[in-house]
Amino acid sequence: MTDPSVHLFGPTDGPTVLAVHGMTGHGRRWRAWSEHLPHARVIAPDLIGHGHAPYTPPWSIEAQVARLSAVLAAHGGGPAVVVGHSYGCALALHLARTEPAAVAGLVLLDPAAELPPDRLLDVAESTVRHDDYTDADEARSDKVHGAWNDVPTELLDEELADHLIDAGNGRVRWRTGTAAVVASWGELARPMAVPPASI
């Protein structure tokens, strides 16, 4: 049976790339990016509390890294080039530090690690206050007027179709667990993991 929380792209016999999304993201976001690496086997799991992964705690960096390790092992093991985005960079660094034999190299995109606690408190509180939208149009507007202002329309449409769900209160929300996201923001105050020099 296929695990809906693990997204696989590219040939099964290609070099392995483990793609780790950022906060409030999901593994399927790597689909368009993976098209630029047609020779590679891209493994892109949803993190705990995101997408189709379990939403139950623990939500620590260690729990996320254990999930990444298990997903990598289930799909042929490493070593893999680990590509992280934002929060995914912190997880990639911890994976490289704790399991260096599984990591062939690191690519860190817009890394988030060892962030100021007061900033993380603001972001976590904002997450609690603003975790849903009136409708899909409001969610789209939030993306377009924020960090997704230069994302092609077709990718934004795909994001809304894949990741926006009914919140159960007449509103819509992203397919994430608010408690998991808030806890994960707190994890980013921890000291940055330093991988072995060999990676």
Predicted region positions:
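Active-site loop/oxyanion-hole signature of alpha/beta-hydrolase fold enzymes
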Residues: 2, 32, 41-83
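Short "lid" loop at the C-terminus of a central beta-strand within the Rossmann-like core
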Residues: 49, 112-115, 164-165
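Conserved serine/cysteine hydrolase catalytic core
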Residues: 166-199
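Gly/Ala-rich beta-loop-alpha elbow adjacent to hydrolase catalytic centers
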Residues: 84-88, 92
